[in-house]
A protein has these predicted regions:
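Short regulatory "switch" loops immediately downstream of catalytic or recognition motifs
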Residues: 10, 168-169
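Soluble or luminal CAZymes and related metallo-dependent hydrolases
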Residues: 129, 196
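Consensus positions within tandem repeat domains that build extended binding/scaffold surfaces
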Residues: 14, 33-36, 56-59, 79-82, ...
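Eukaryote-biased recognition of intrinsically disordered, low-complexity regulatory segments
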Residues: 9-17
Length: 207
């Protein structure tokens, strides 16, 4: 830790004999550095204090046994590939101040079946939830931008609901590549969905 920034987690404790499965970051740390926990394959749970306001790119990249994460209340962005490759991540608790989910943030989180998005989110960037276990997604009211291939490779994805607030789908037509089980897309009435999807997908509209 330097200047309240956790730069790197030293994964081995007890004279380098026993890997630690749960880590509690001390209160007072304000930032988690880039790749700080990268490849900590033994880590199952990390407790992040509310003093943390920034989690940098790839901070938890390939922590393959990480099961749960609760985002501190003052973090406004999930950075590039922050939790990418956390294939056993099942529980993600987001806060009410989160504004942006960056590229590849949760890519390859195979066990992630559901996520509750707060209405504070304005932007979800491309590839952010590709190759996850998501089954049903309700995008939050307040969301304005969604990037391309966000749900690419989500083989279990069955249903997606878009909010009235959405202004830009920067997907060049593609948002649901490799989503063979997609059955339903729910849209606000009058919304023009210029996307490529299978003919078997039903479109529903709401007021």
């Amino acid at each position: 830790i330097k200047d309240n920034v956790l730069l790197e987690y030293k994964r081995w404790i007890l004279a380098d004999i026993m890997p630690k499965k749960e880590v509690e970051i001390p209160y007072g740390v304000t930032e988690i550095g880039e790749k700080a926990f990268k490849n900590c394959s033994e880590l199952k749970k990390v407790v992040i204090p509310d003093s943390v306001v920034k989690i940098n790119s790839c901070a938890f990249l390939d922590c393959k046994n990480l099961i749960e994460v609760k985002l501190p209340e003052n973090v406004t962005e999930i950075s590039f590939a922050c939790f990418s490759g956390c294939k056993h991540l099942r529980t993600v608790v987001l806060n009410g101040k989160l504004d942006n989910i960056d590229m590849f943030a949760f890519a390859n989180c195979k066990d992630l079946e559901y996520i509750d998005f707060p209405n504070s989110i304005r932007k979800i960037d491309e590839f952010s939830f590709c190759y996850t276990g998501l089954k049903k997604v309700e995008l939050p009211e307040g969301l304005e931008y969604i990037g391309g291939e966000v749900f690419m490779g989500d083989e279990n994805l069955e249903e997606v609901k878009f909010p009235k607030s959405l202004e830009i789908i920067d997907a060049k037509g593609y948002l649901f590549d490799e989503c063979p089980n997609l059955k339903k897309i729910i849209l606000p009435k009058g919304f023009d969905l210029d996307l490529v999807y299978d003919d078997t997908v039903s479109i529903e509209y709401y007021e």
